[in-house]
């Protein structure tokens, strides 16, 4: 075996994709010292997406001062690549859940304003191409905060300017984009998301994700009503119907809320990464792909990171073995086309024990070593 590609997603809550790949690489080097190993950090639009891109593209990291979800000053960073032409921005760095203590989370009051400030900073530096990863947000403002930071105004029925927070979506009566940053006209945005939820409704942004952002049942209904109302206002002003667009409900409606006002497109995060980093070219000459994530289950089959990796492996006729901290729906995963689906736990443990970073890395190393030892016996 001459070439193995390591394309691991993060084991969420335990170990990031980079450290997982390092543990796997160590095991392979010990068993197959002459094997070429290519580490390929992976994410699906959620946490780690921009980190994976910045790492692989050797991005220049820049910092700027913006506002957090409650409009408090915060310092953030993002990546610049392609000789300053492209900015890679993680939405969560300015308005992510980890920025707010769990007992203070309230998507009625939070805003994406800081993300718009990051974009404005990148525009000043000359960037005109953007990749924005929109997973892990603490917001449900449909992106009006970001747009306000870029010059848009959202007015109520009395022409009063609204604060760009979730509870005010229901009050939006007019949208004024006459002062939108002129550099946006020559800019393009790729919005990388990891979900396909519509803008509103039972499967929409508020009902599915607002509870984990701190909303109670009444607030969920209010937020959903706000999204319904705002979608109608957008349709009246732009003639674009975002109501049932797949992915429009990502990041509290930001997925759909940006499309009518920016030169933007929604893409699966894994597709963005695989295309941007030319994963297919890397895989074409490989003998094996090792991949994995914290939990392998039915979600794995639904357009997430490993699904994208598997599709490339099948196209290039390269076997794909998936490792998971926990494995459910093994038969469904096998039917997807994985060569093998393996749990890394050597014996029953509590979830808390299983999530310990060192334990996870040891288990990855041990499992990869066993996989490689089996392969060695059949490739002599």
For the regions a language model picked out, list residue spans one by one.
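N-terminal loops that bind phosphate or other acidic moieties
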Residues: 2-134, 138-380
